[in-house]
């Protein structure tokens, strides 16, 4: 079969639905992306992920294919009129912004992102503005701006790996940012729950939470059973059974503390857990999901992050 190459913006009309089948790979030219005014159903399987990537198949250097370089295409945008979007088992990488959710009615589900990868973006991984979004079992990694940026709305992150090891610019943003203001406009943060998730990266502080300070504008957030690379704080109202990384731990800085491979020199990454990670067996069972990012069954003592650790497979 011939590859599907997209030039220019693919626009999904309001009241229309774009369905992308399991195993589909879409190649986007530098000016191409998807603007969703209606709905998107991109539902792959563990065996047949949907892949959204740039169209260049050559190399920048001998060791570096363009498929591993950020900023190759325009990513996805869900506009104000877009609701009830579902993405499962999707691998999106190499774009500018990965996924942008424009401001919308927070009482209606805008996006369910489940068992997905958003990686190596020359902008945001996920930029969520005043929207209702549920993110689970997903890897959001290596972005110039925030891996996940939440500007108001209702957002849940469960069993996610959010790691900021972006190699192409030292001015990379924190892995996770959340606030109740954008462009000097107050936007209530109804909820930002980060559960059973890893938030880490190179810098000592990978979390940026900013409250406008206006008591009339909601700023609701919780961290539950997560591992955070940020200065330790005592906040019994918002932080529950959560571990703070030691910023002096060079293994964490190098990614070796948690992940199988973080090689900035060759731009090779594998965010499956290493056998040294404190994420193993540390998730909250009450919030745990039965399967991980790869579709593997979690055990009775599930792990924090999107990947369950399996000793046998990791030793092969």
Positions of the model-derived regions?
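Beta-strand/loop edge motif enriched in small/polar residues
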Residues: 1-269, 276-293, 307-316
């Amino acid at each position: 079969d011939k590859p599907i190459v997209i030039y220019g913006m693919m626009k999904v009309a309001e009241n229309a639905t774009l369905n992308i089948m399991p195993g589909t790979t879409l190649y986007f030219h530098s000016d191409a992306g998807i603007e969703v005014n209606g709905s998107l159903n991109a539902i792959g399987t563990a065996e047949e992920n949907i892949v959204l990537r740039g169209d260049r198949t050559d190399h920048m250097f001998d060791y570096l294919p363009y498929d591993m370089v950020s900023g190759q295409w325009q990513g996805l945008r869900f506009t104000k009129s877009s609701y009830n979007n579902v993405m499962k088992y999707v691998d999106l990488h190499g774009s500018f912004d990965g996924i942008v959710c424009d401001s919308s009615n927070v009482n209606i589900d805008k996006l369910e992102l489940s068992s997905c990868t958003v990686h190596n973006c020359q902008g945001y991984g996920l930029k969520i503005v005043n929207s209702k979004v549920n993110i689970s079992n997903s890897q959001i990694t290596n972005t110039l701006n925030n891996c996940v940026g939440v500007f108001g709305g209702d957002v849940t992150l469960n069993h996610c790996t959010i790691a900021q090891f972006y190699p192409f610019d030292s001015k990379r943003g924190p892995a996770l940012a959340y606030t109740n203001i954008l462009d000097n406009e107050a936007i209530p943060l109804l909820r930002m729950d980060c559960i059973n998730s890893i938030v880490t990266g190179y810098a000592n502080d990978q979390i940026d939470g900013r409250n406008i300070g206006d008591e009339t504008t909601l700023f609701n957030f919780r961290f539950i059973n997560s591992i955070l690379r940020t200065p330790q704080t005592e906040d019994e109202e918002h932080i529950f059974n959560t571990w703070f990384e030691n910023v002096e731990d060079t293994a964490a800085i190098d990614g070796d503390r948690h992940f199988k491979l973080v090689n900035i020199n060759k731009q090779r990454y594998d965010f499956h857990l290493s056998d040294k990670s404190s994420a193993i067996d540390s998730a909250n069972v009450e919030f745990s999901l039965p399967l991980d990012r790869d579709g593997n069954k979690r055990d009775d003592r599930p792990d924090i992050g999107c990947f369950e650790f399996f000793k046998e497979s990791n030793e092969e």
